Curated annotation (Swiss-Prot), chain A:
Species of provenance: Caenorhabditis elegans
GO CC annotations, alphabetized: mitochondrial small ribosomal subunit
Extent of the transit peptide: 1-23
An example molecular function term from Gene Ontology annotations: structural constituent of ribosome
GO biological process terms held by the UniProt record: mitochondrial translation
Keyword Ribonucleoprotein carried by entry: yes
Name of protein: Small ribosomal subunit protein uS3m
Location in the cell: Mitochondrion
């Protein structure tokens, strides 16, 4: 009995504690700089809800169509493998950290498109060799022909849509 | 899309000051010079000398050389870029070199390919801008949106024409009989086979739905007698469409399309031969067992003929119209009657029934 009275007293002194909202939604939000030096590509500048309206997808295949979902998880895993390989294999030539690599699938062919830059070092023979190696390696790994159709730009500024 | 950049600034960099001092920092304050020079003027909390460790590198640092260059103290040889040869051999964009009027585009872009801004001589732009009048949409070079979308630059009208010319030798002319008379298709080609091939991306080209085969047979072309036809229709059940006169056989129980096709042909053969068989119990067939209500042998026919004969015998009742009540008009009425009895009753059909009946009996319309 006594304990319960104490309990009630303790309850009466309690209050609902409130804190400010934690606005954790960070997708598509870019932080601007005071001197407008932060580079934004078109892909970055458009918000996630603009996908399919203002910007299109970074992966093109038929496995996400109705009645064609036969190996969708495989496709997602393959995409990640390809993206990581390209990021790791062309570290000197990446544009915006290799976040914008387009993967297209046509028939049994996997096509990797996007942009690379040569501002640091232009070694044409080396690039040809690396393209050949990447194509061959990914073809063996994924058991299907892989084509690299990546275009070179002078520097990262060439893909800049805006500076904020 | 989000990219983190760590920009660290050294707020208290002593190195820069030391460099400035080394180059010609005579105008700096004395105290600063002492500190920068690594003097022993600074005491630590124990009162001992704080000897700052600073090892000047033997080579001149970048800032030092830049300052010396700027002030003209020394002359430095300007060296060309180490990748100069590669940069010189770099080709200018092909779109600038090419003459779009003279060259064949099919040779430049023969097959499906990702958009390449250096090759396509079109002044295209893609992307949105909040205010297009102020700033034009994103340019062709380095435009990822143009790279993403599938293009049809390999399917220009001349390219399609070229392809058609190339495969023309494999084509046979369309049958002229069918061109002149399209309705004769079912007569010349009584069996049509439908199947679907599914093309989609993936390492496997198999699709289980491609095994389904639909076979459509124009039953009238089987040249069966009336009894045989009725038996075939009864065996085919709901596979026979009365309106079009076509029987549809859909086979999907085998694994491959070829097997299903063979099975469909087998089913057709079996149906055909089964329909031709005459069993003992076929003779037991009654009028009520027929698929359709027949005019011949019906109560209506007997009553009608009886009525017509009575009318002929009656002297006062002479048929007004010529030829009413003869065999031809009875047959005509019979056809109408059969259609009326074997289909859904509508207002028009009932009116037609009345009209025919009046005509048969010679009553004024």
């Amino acid at each position: 009995m006594l304990r319960s009275i104490q309990h009630v007293e303790a309850l009466s002194s309690r209050q609902i504690s409130t804190t400010s909202m934690l606005l954790k939604n960070r997708a598509g939000k870019t932080k601007s700089t005071s001197n407008r030096t932060q580079l934004l590509t078109y892909e970055m500048a458009q918000k996630p809800h603009h996908i399919g309206v203002r910007k299109s997808w970074l992966t093109w295949h038929s496995q996400n169509l109705e009645e064609f979902r036969q190996s969708q998880p495989l496709v997602v895993a393959q995409d990640e493998v390809v993206r990581r390989f390209i990021r790791g294999f062309f570290p000197q030539n990446l544009v915006v950290s290799g976040n914008e690599i387009v993967i297209k699938r046509r028939g049994n062919v996997l096509i990797v498109a996007g942009f690379l830059q040569y501002s640091r070092r232009l070694d044409i023979r080396r690039i040809y060799w690396m393209f050949g190696f990447a194509e061959e390696f990914l073809s063996i790994l994924l058991k299907q022909p892989v084509k690299l159709e990546m275009a070179f730009v002078e520097s990262e500024e060439d893909v800049a849509y805006n500076y904020i | 899309m989000h990219r983190l950049t760590h920009v660290s600034t050294r707020n208290r960099s002593s190195l820069a000051e030391k460099l400035r001092n080394a180059v010609g920092g005579q105008d700096f304050g004395k105290a600063k010079q002492i500190v920068a020079g690594g003097s022993i003027a600074v005491k630590d909390e124990h009162g001992e000398d704080f000897r700052e460790l600073y090892v000047m590198p033997k080579r001149k640092l970048r800032g030092q050389t830049q300052l010396e260059q700027a002030t003209g103290r020394t002359e430095y040889k300007t060296r060309s870029r180490f990748d100069l040869m590669d940069r010189l051999t770099k080709r200018p964009p092909r779109s600038e070199e090419m003459d779009p009027e003279a060259q064949k585009w099919c040779d430049v872009w023969p097959a499906a390919r990702t958009f390449a801004s250096s090759v396509v001589p079109l002044p295209v732009r893609m992307g949105t801008r909040p205010n297009v009048e102020k700033r034009a949409p994103f340019k062709k070079e380095g435009n990822l949106e143009l790279v993403k979308i599938p293009n049809f630059l390999h399917l220009t009208p001349p390219a399609i024409q070229q392809h058609c010319q190339a495969i023309k030798k494999f084509c046979t002319p369309f049958p002229p009989e069918l061109l002149s008379n399209p309705s004769a298709t079912c007569q010349h080609l009584p069996i049509s086979i439908e199947y679907s091939t599914y093309i989609h991306q993936g390492t496997s080209i198999r699709d289980i739905r491609s095994r389904v085969v639909t076979m459509k047979i124009h039953v009238a072309e089987l040249k069966l007698s009336e009894n045989q036809m009725e038996k075939l229709i009864r065996l085919a059940a709901n596979r026979y469409d009365e309106k079009t006169g076509k029987m549809t056989i859909i086979t999907d129980r085998c694994h491959t399309r070829q097997q299903n096709l063979d099975y469909a042909h087998y089913l057709l053969t079996v149906l055909y031969h089964e329909a031709q068989k005459v069993e003992k119990w076929d003779e037991l067939k009654n009028r009520t067992d027929a698929l359709k209500v027949e005019f011949d042998g019906s109560n209506t026919k007997t009553k009608l003929i009886d009525l017509l004969e009575k009318a002929k015998l009656t002297p006062g009742l002479s048929p007004s119209a010529a030829g009413c009540g003869d065999q031809k008009s009875i047959d005509e009425f019979g056809e109408m009657w059969k259609a009326y009895r074997n289909s859904e009753e509508t207002v028009e059909k009932t009116r037609e029934y009345g009209r025919q009946m009046k005509k048969l009996l010679g009553i004024q319309q």
